[in-house]
Amino acid sequence: MSDLDYYQVLGVSRTASQEEIKRAYRKLVLKYHPDHNPGDKNAEQKIKNINEAYDILKDEKKRSAYDQLGHQAFKNSGGGNYQQHHGFTGGIDPNDIFENIFGDFMGARRSSKTAFSKKAGANLKYDISLTLEEAFYGVTKIISFKTALTCDACAGKGSLDNNSTSSCPTCRGSGVTRSQQGFFFFENTCQTCRGAGHVIKNPCTKCYGEGRYINTRNLEVKIPAGVKEGSRIKLTGEGEAGSRGGKTGDLYVCITLIPHNTFSVDGNDLHCQLDINCTTAALGGEVEVADITGSKLKLKIPAGTQNNHKLKLSGKGMQILHSDRCGNMIVHVNIKVPKSLTKSQRELMIKLDKELNEASEEGFLSKVRNFWASGSE
C-alpha cells in the first residue's frame, strides 16, 4: 500500500460526504480510463491510486481507521503489497462508473463476465395516478422518465468501427488476473475487460463503449377504459436499451387511482352514499342521483327503507376492461333525522309517535289474547 493522501488523490476535503467522494471518483475514472489513454503509463498509475483511495474512503470503517491512524491502520493486516498485479486492483472496478449509471438504474448490477458482450436492457416500472373519470373513459398520457437510450452515434454497438474488439492487454485474453497478499495468492476477474477477455478497440466517444447513454425520454401511453387500482400495462420494447445491441427491456405502467369525492370502487362496481329524510324512508319516493358520467338518474326509494339499505342501479358502474359492459352502481341509503322541528312539525311527530305506539301495544295485546285462546282449547 502506498503512502498517498487519499483525500488529495480524489480531490475532496476530509469532511466530504459519500456522495461527493463517489462523484469525484466517477469523474476521475472517466478521465484516466485506459480506453481513453491507451499505452499511457502515467494514466495507468493514476487509476491505481484512484482505486486505492476510493476503496478506503467509500467504506466508513476503513475511512475511520485511516482518519485516526493513517496508512499504519492497514500495514499489519495482510503482510504484503496492496497491489501486485496488472490492471485495476484493490477490489475497485474502474467500470463502476458504468455500473452506477446503467446497472443501478433499476437496481440490477451487470455481470462482470458479460460486461463487453451484448446485454439485454432492464425492464422499467412507471407509476401513474389517474382520476376515476380517466380510468372510466380511458386516457392518453405523456410520461417523462430517465432511462438508458440506444446511442445514436454508434448505433448501439459501442464502437466507432466494425472491428470493435481486441484481446485484453491486461489479462491477455484469459479474463482473470493474479495477485499476492502476504503468503496468499488470489485469482480475480480481470477488471480491465471485466472477465470477457477482450476490450473495445475504438470505443464510441459519446457512450464510452457502452452502446447506450442516459437521457430523458417522453413517451405517449394509451391507457384503456376500465383500468383499476394496481392494473399494470406492459409496453413491450419500451424499457431500458440493451448494451451493445442487446435486447431492449419492457416498460410496465402501474396504475394508482386518486380517491374520488363521491364514489369508491369495488371490482367493477361503484359505491356512493345518499342522504334521505325520514319521511321519504317511511313513505317511499323518487330521488335523483348522478352517475360517474354526470348524468342524472331516477332512483326509487321503497316505502319502509331502513338506514344503510343498499339500492342497485344496474350497468351504471365502472367500465369493464376490454368490454362494452359496465358494472353496477350501489347506492347506500343514510336516513337523516332532523335536529330541530317547528311547532307544527313537533305536534305531527308526537301524534305519529302516539299512533305507532298504540298500534304496537294493540299488536302485543292481540298476540297475548291469541296465545291464551289457543291454550284453552
Swiss-Prot record:
Keywords: Chaperone, Cytoplasm, DNA replication, Metal-binding, Repeat, Stress response, Zinc, Zinc-finger. Zn(2+) 1 binds at C151, C154, C204, C207. It comes from the Bacteria. GO terms for cellular component: cytoplasm. The J domain is necessary and sufficient to stimulate DnaK ATPase activity. Zinc center 1 plays an important role in the autonomous, DnaK-independent chaperone activity of DnaJ. Zinc center 2 is essential for interaction with DnaK and for DnaJ activity. Residues 5-70 form the J domain. One of its GO terms (molecular function) is zinc ion binding. Belongs to the DnaJ family. A zinc finger (CR-type) spans 138-216. This is Chaperone protein DnaJ.
